[in-house]
Amino acid sequence: MRHRVCATLIEEQQILMVELHTPSRTFWTLPGGGVESGETKEQAVIREVLEETHLHVTIERQLYEILIDQGIETCFLVQRTSGSSSAPRLGIDPELPFDQQELRTVRFRPLKDLQDDPQIARLLTLL
């Protein structure tokens, strides 16, 4: 069973999100990805945020763990490490060739504009 992690980073009423473009659709989601062999969920979420956004984060707490179509998803509330004040920059997925990258954009998006997003709505009930 595949285990996926995601990160919730909120600053000034905005949430960090990445835009993905897959062969079937384009959508916004939280930074995250799969847990690699020998890696903890916590290590995976820190690595995924760094790969996708170039931000260094620490974990505050686990927000949820749910069953999804592809396996299990665990989401963590994270914060930037002290001294990490740079803006997020688009990273890469090292598992995909350069010409097949799915990451398109990374930025903070206003929470008030995302009330209808099911993933964000779930998070807001847990914060």
PLM regions: where:
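Conserved N-terminal beta-strand and adjoining loop/helix that marks the start
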Residues: 1-16, 37
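Conserved hydrophobic "DFG−1" position in protein kinase catalytic cores
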Residues: 9-10, 17, 78, 108
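A conserved beta-turn-beta hairpin within the catalytic core of GNAT-like acetyltransferases
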Residues: 23-26
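C-terminal/domain-terminus segments
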Residues: 124-127
